[in-house]
Amino acid sequence: MELRRGGVGSQAAGRRMDGDCRDGGCGSKDAGSEDYENLPTSASVSTHMTAGAMAGILEHSIMYPVDSVKTRMQSLNPDPKARYTSIYGALKRIMHTEGFWRPLRGLNVMMMGAGPAHAMYFACYENMKRTLNDVFSHQGNSHLANGIAGSMATLLHDAVMNPAEVVKQRLQMYNSQHQSALSCIRTVWRTEGLGAFYRSYTTQLTMNIPFQSIHFITYEFLQEQVNPRRDYNPQSHIISGGLAGALAAAATTPLDVCKTLLNTQENMALSLANVSGRLSGMANAFRTVYQLNGLAGYFKGIQARVIYQMPSTAISWSVYEFFKYFLTKRQLENRTLY
């Protein structure tokens, strides 16, 4: 990651927080910021991957119970016992009726996917951003370059993450037939084949690319309002990122609902829609959602999705930025010593 002034303007939505500084100061002149400014102008690929992996694991681990509720609230034909009106009420009922640890079922497979997925995302994004910015803009920051870099990084991220999403969402559903991630993987592989793990991949990409575009535009606008000097300012990055992530999450909820349907293959819902076999394809998912619930169906779970996305983005950026700073500083100190 380049450490230059104007930093965060180049980040892709919801995935990173840039603390770049160059040519002098960035905000307050405490010891921490001075140390930050004295770091080398780029971090290694291993630093980006390690920091990204930590950010992904912590983000998904902390917010996983809310994600479990979101998945259930997006169900098109939920069991009467699994109809919820609020996140708090849902978590309380799930823990009371299904066990204290039930909201965490599937967390292990999510962590296994989030680590490598986020590691590849950050490493790919940082290196492509730097390369493409040199091509498109000699001034150092091109929105086109950042957008292309983010889109390419998303292809890698979702290729790793999609199978984990399929497994964890099936484990999260009410009355799931799967008791563990391993049994779910075996059952899906045996009954539906390898393609089932990527049935929602195109929908995932279709959702994430506009998500990042909306987040990027909103984030840049908010940064101009709260941090016009574009200094390294963790508070402004977290606030702007959280609000931008919330807007992007709300706008892309219809795509997320379709993705959930493709991942979970709700038998009751598909039966009501007269769908035989397995549902595949984003267009078919859109038609099925509308057939069952009308326009309102596209916004099922929007509250949970927004509440999930805001702190997730803040956690991801703050953790990534901390580990990037910490690891780069350690590498610099080791080179100085030896």
Curated annotation (Swiss-Prot):
Its main location: mitochondrion. Residues 1-37 are annotated as: Disordered. InterPro entries: Mitochondrial_sb/sol_carrier, Mt_carrier_dom_sf. One of its GO terms (molecular function) is iron ion transmembrane transporter activity. Pfam families: Mito_carr. It catalyses: Fe(2+)(in) = Fe(2+)(out). The chain crosses the membrane at residues 45-64, 106-125, 143-162, 200-219, 234-253, 301-320. It is a multi-pass membrane protein. It is found in: Mitochondrion inner membrane. SUPFAM superfamilies: Mitochondrial carrier. It comes from the Eukaryota. Solcar repeats lie at residues 43-131, 141-225, 232-326. GO terms for biological process: iron import into the mitochondrion; positive regulation of hemoglobin biosynthetic process. Keywords: Ion transport, Iron, Iron transport, Membrane, Mitochondrion, Mitochondrion inner membrane, Repeat, Transmembrane, Transmembrane helix, Transport. Interacts with ACB10; this interaction stabilizes SLC25A37 and enhances the function of SLC25A37 to import mitochondrial iron during erythroid differentiation. Belongs to the mitochondrial carrier (TC 2.A.29) family. Mitochondrial iron transporter that specifically mediates iron uptake in developing erythroid cells, thereby playing an essential role in heme biosynthesis. This is Mitoferrin-1. It comes from Rattus norvegicus (Rat). The gene is Slc25a37.
